[in-house]
């Protein structure tokens, strides 16, 4: 792996926490996907419970991403899913977990956020 800049992607949609690091040629350097837990017999998750689970999963996923050989110091951009649909007013609380993490990382390492 050469020293090109990498991209960090974060998604906290309703039923899965995802974090990935990719190279500009599409090579996947790191890929984390973890389904949220739904209690047996339940039909789904309330937004508050899903948000809580994302907040619990993101630190470990991001720590593992940055500990992957060759990643630290090479993130050139951060991307995040910020809402369920690309229309004005589209909102679900679960997306705030990923958006908060992505904004914090992008600001702290001085890279663009998409």
Locate the predicted segments by residue.
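Short acidic/glycine-rich loops and adjacent helix/strand connectors
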Residues: 1-114
């Amino acid at each position: 792996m050469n020293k090109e800049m990498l991209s960090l992607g974060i998604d906290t949609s309703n039923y899965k926490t995802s974090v990935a690091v990719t190279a500009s040629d599409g090579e996947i350097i790191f890929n984390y996907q973890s389904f949220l837990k739904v209690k047996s017999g339940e039909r789904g998750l309330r937004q508050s419970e899903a948000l809580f689970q994302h907040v619990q999963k993101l630190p470990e996923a991001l720590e593992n991403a940055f500990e992957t050989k060759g990643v630290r110091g090479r993130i050139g951009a951060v991307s995040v899913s910020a809402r369920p649909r690309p229309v004005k007013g589209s909102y679900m609380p679960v997306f705030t977990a990923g958006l908060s993490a992505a904004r914090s990382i992008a600001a702290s390492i001085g890279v663009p956020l998409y």
